[in-house]
From Swiss-Prot:
Its EC number is 7.1.3.1. It comes from Agrobacterium fabrum (strain C58 / ATCC 33970). The gene is hppA. NCBIfam families: PRK00733.1-2, PRK00733.3-5, V_PPase. InterPro entries: PPase-energised_H-pump. This is K(+)-insensitive pyrophosphate-energized proton pump.
Length: 714
């Protein structure tokens, strides 16, 4: 089985990378526009590459220490797995950003010809990042699994293979949390600081070249939404596939179906890469000029093709009949196929729900715009109300997904649903990475003084880009929540396995019964401790953005004060100073909060062990803390990302001209618009820093707990 399916899976991963290379050539061959556009894009490119180089250097230092620890505490193959996960995650983000900072001016230039041409370049740029994320993640896991089992000769379900693959997921997780948090602090420090002085104090429009923070804002779009999201979804993809393979190794140990069950998630991802590539060719602007409609055509085509891909993957690996029993439940290939379908349906519903809560001209966004008419305070109140309300429907969908898949295929069925969800990652990341390119294109059009019709086209693309970014975050959080649940299942089952084999693993000998009962005070304590982590983490992230934004406010005011010619247009702002200031702030502020979810499981386990003297109580508290992180993290992340997206598009409503309930039209520069800018400055760090960074924090706590078990077993 492995000998036939794995090479095909690897070939699918290679095709994804080949598609990305071919599309890169197509994007880079497009017209770059006039000299002024090239000059502005050059500033953005230099700033983004300088920031990312410094960020990766910082991560490399931390990563090197962790790799040495993995080698010492686990094994050489675990350390190599960690390095593979970290390096490939970094490469996906770096190459994606490398293309996006070159596609921005080409999109602006293409938009000067037609809206469709602008959409084509921006989407292709996003598709490059998307296919690299899916392709490199699949190649990393499948090739390393093949090497471990076929070249090094480890049995597929052995602890050596499981530990090495979990370490690969940990490598991706560590990059992800740093990239998400660091990129988020940079981008929102620039955005909020620049808006407060530029729009509110000086009364100049967004992306005005007189604002010294403008270039930093455009740099931030790339390092946050392109490189950051790429690392985030790479990690979710790799971690969820690995977790599902770990469950297969536990549930089907010693049965003939073991290898097929472990390869099944890889086969699903391989098939879905092909369907995602096919889906990209359906993104074309129709006669109604609906940009969202064009993007949805591609997403719907990918989803429909993925049903067939899922069927082929199921038939080629586990077949349609009975494959074994999980927790006394008979599992069939047909049931697992339906679990995959549930994953695709959950994805579709989360996309639709998130678009409803963040899309322009929808009730939630209109309610915030209407609240802006009566002032700043009412805007913030209504924005918070929408952010809280937006958690209900996604949570109900996720609950339905969990129960439905558990009834069909047990916890392994839930893992297959998450794998099918992440099979669509190539197309979903393409929709997300489309956002920063269109945002930058609008900035370049404004700064280069292009025709107002060009700015109108880029604004239309950017408004959709805001929604696609929010939709992608909803998808990333939903899949992360389900993925973390699969990781928790792996933790609980690993724990049972070690406890049942105490003679082989002496640390776990005679530890007694491990109970997750709520009557156990250590379980309740663990739940509460885990529950506080997303809030504390989010609070630290918001504080970091506030500090960075304050520094930018001071810097922009200083430049306006010391260079009066800037506002008159006779002096050039010092763009590099703001970029450098933010780079230092983001790198400095990202390290401590990033270590919080890494260290939390260790604090819980060893803290409870020290207090209670019972290993069973410590493991129960640790397991409960993982559930606390998953549940609270899910709600915190959804409320922040959807609420922030709604605030942003409420502000956009005024830029297009918002007609309130009394029929009065409010435009850019009006008092209502100023109130919406205040809401947007609150929503920005909500949706682009704290909310998205909670996502990898949820998974990293679960992975560290899994690795802790492996270390103790050694």
């Amino acid at each position: 089985m492995r000998m036939t399916v794995i090479p095909i899976v690897i070939l699918c991963g290679v095709l994804s990378v080949v598609y990305a290379v071919w599309t890169t050539k197509s994007v880079l061959d497009a017209d770059q526009g006039n000299e002024r556009m090239r000059e502005i894009a050059g500033y953005i490119r230099e700033g983004a590459q300088a920031y990312l180089t410094r960020q990766y250097l910082t991560i490399a230092i931390v990563g090197l220490i962790v790799a040495v620890l993995a080698w010492y505490l686990l094994s050489a193959i675990a350390a190599i797995g960690f390095v593979i996960g970290a390096v490939l995650s970094g490469v996906a983000g770096f190459v994606g950003m490398h293309v996006s900072v070159r596609a921005n001016l080409r999109t602006a230039q293409a938009a000067s010809h037609s809206l469709g041409a602008g959409l084509d370049i921006a989407f292709k740029s996003g598709a490059i990042t998307g296919m690299l994320v899916a392709g490199l993640a699949l190649l990393g896991v499948s090739i390393y699994y093949f090497v471990l089992t076929s070249v090094l000769g480890h049995p597929p379900g052995s602890r050596a293979v499981i530990d090495a693959l979990v370490s690969l997921g940990f490598g991706a997780s560590l990059i992800s949390i740093f990239a998400r948090l660091g990129g988020g602090i940079f981008t929102k420090g620039a955005d909020v600081g620049g808006d407060l002085v530029g729009k509110v104090e000086a009364g100049i429009p967004e992306d005005d070249p007189r604002n010294p923070a403008t270039i930093a804002d455009n740099v931030g779009d790339n390092v946050g939404d392109c490189a950051g999201m790429a690392a985030d979804l790479f990690e979710t993809y790799a971690v969820s596939v690995v977790a599902t393979m770990v469950l297969a190794a536990i549930f089907f140990a010693g049965t003939p179906i073991l290898e097929s069950a472990m390869v099944y998630p890889l086969a699903i991802c391989g098939a879905c890469i092909l369907t995602s590539i096919a889906g990209t060719f359906f993104v074309k602007l129709g006669t109604n000029n609906s940009i969202m409609g064009a993007l949805y055509k591609g997403l719907i085509a990918t989803g429909v093709f993925s049903v067939a891909g899922l069927a082929v993957a199921t038939y080629a690996t586990v077949g349609w009949g009975t494959i074994g029993t999980v927790a006394g439940m008979e599992i069939t290939g047909t049931n697992l196929f339906f679990c995959g379908l549930v994953g695709l349906v959950v994805t579709a519903l989360i996309v639709v729900i998130t678009e409803y809560y963040t899309g322009t001209n929808k009730r939630p966004v209109n309610s915030i715009a209407q609240a802006s008419v009566t002032g700043h305070g009412t805007n913030v109140i209504q924005g918070l109300a929408v952010s809280l309300e937006s958690t209900a429907l996604p949570a109900i969908v996720i609950v339905g997904g969990i129960i439905g898949t558990y009834q069909l295929g047990g916890l392994f069925g839930t893992g297959i649903a998450v794998t099918a969800m992440l099979g669509l990652a190539g197309m979903i990341v393409a929709l997300d990475a489309f956002g920063p390119v269109t945002d930058n294109a609008g900035g370049i059009a404004e700064m280069a003084g292009l025709d107002p019709d060009v700015r109108k086209a880029t604004d239309a693309l950017d408004a959709v880009g805001n929604t696609t970014k929010a939709v992608t975050k909803g998808y990333a959080i939903g899949s992360a929540g389900l993925g973390a649940l699969v990781l928790f299942a792996a933790y609980a089952n690993d724990l049972s396995y070690f406890a049942a084999n105490g003679d082989t693993y002496p640390y776990f000998k005679d530890i007694g019964e491990i109970s997750f009962s709520l009557a156990n005070p250590y379980v309740v304590a663990g739940l509460l401790f885990g529950g506080l982590i997303p809030y504390l983490f989010g609070g630290i992230a918001m504080t970091a953005v506030g500090k960075a934004a304050s520094a930018i406010v001071e810097e922009v005011r200083r430049q306006f004060r010391e260079k009066p010619g800037i506002m008159a247009g006779t002096e050039k702002p010092d763009y590099g100073r703001a970029v450098d200031l933010l780079t230092k702030a983001a790198i400095r502020e990202m390290v401590i909060p990033s270590l919080l979810p890494v260290l939390a499981p260790l604090v819980v386990y060893f803290g409870v062990l020290l207090i209670s003297g019972s290993k069973a109580s410590a493991f129960a508290a640790l397991g409960a803390s993982l559930l606390g992180v998953i549940i609270n993290g899910l709600f915190v992340a959804i409320s922040m990302t959807s609420g922030g997206g709604a605030w942003d598009n409420a502000k956009k409503s005024f830029e297009d001209g918002f007609i309130d309930k009394d029929g009065v039209r409010h435009v850019k520069g009006s008092e209502a618009h100023k109130a919406s800018v205040t809401g947007d400055t609150v929503g920005d760090p909500y949706k682009d820093t704290a909310g998205p960074a909670v996502n990898p924090a949820i998974k990293i706590t679960n992975i560290v707990a899994l690795l802790l078990l492996a270390v103790l077993a050694h």
